[in-house]
Amino acid sequence: IDTVTVGKQPSGMSINRAGNLALIANRADNSISVLSIQGKQVKLVDTVAMGEHVAHVAFTPDGKRALAGKFPGHKVALLEVDGSKVTYAKRDLAVGLWPYNLDVTPDGRLALTADNGNNGGSDGNVDTVSVIDLEANPPRVIDKVVVGDAPEGFAISPTGRLAVAVLLRGSNNSKTEWFYNRNGSVVVLKIDGKKVTKVGEVEVRGLPEGAVFSPDGRWLYVGNFMDEDISVLRVDGDTVTNTGTLVKLPGKPASMRGRTQ
């Protein structure tokens, strides 16, 4: 119904829980676009300079803060939100290498980042998920959890009990590379208070990038870019299993959107 012009190479987007403000991370522009939402009207109201490439952005549940992943800087920027005014006071947190995706728990206590590693691609070496304590003053990184090679897609369940990091595992690399795998995988992380622990790993298909939970948290859907389909996984407590069901798509799924922040 309309087109809104933002910055160059828009890479990540987040809409606040109230549904009246959206932020877009513009990778090639080193900026974040601020959009107001009123009914079906969406307008660009501001652009915030970030100084470096930003790959993704996420609101906290109360809408008073947002976090932006500074992809090549290996940092997460903290932004303050007051109405439609978004301010960046150059407060950054050092996380793992090449943070690409990030999410905030539904209770707003933690933020987790998928640290993609190796300039945003597989190299056979393990990478991490960084754990940020948002209740601390000031917020800080309290842990880094080793997950595997090249976590890109990332999601936290609606209950806040689980998170998943989607590993590329060299599935988009040449078959001659020593770290090549035909399929990627999903690493399951248990969230217990402020402790995050790897509890499982499930193989999916080629170059998995996006992941979303169903609203009730009982299902997980993973988009497989190379195979042009979606893997359907069942969630039972802390256990995630691949049902083997595939939903064929007419194109390559590069990202997916799930629960409201």
Give residue spans per PLM region:
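Predominantly soluble domains enriched in secretory-pathway, periplasmic, or organellar proteins
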Residues: 1-261
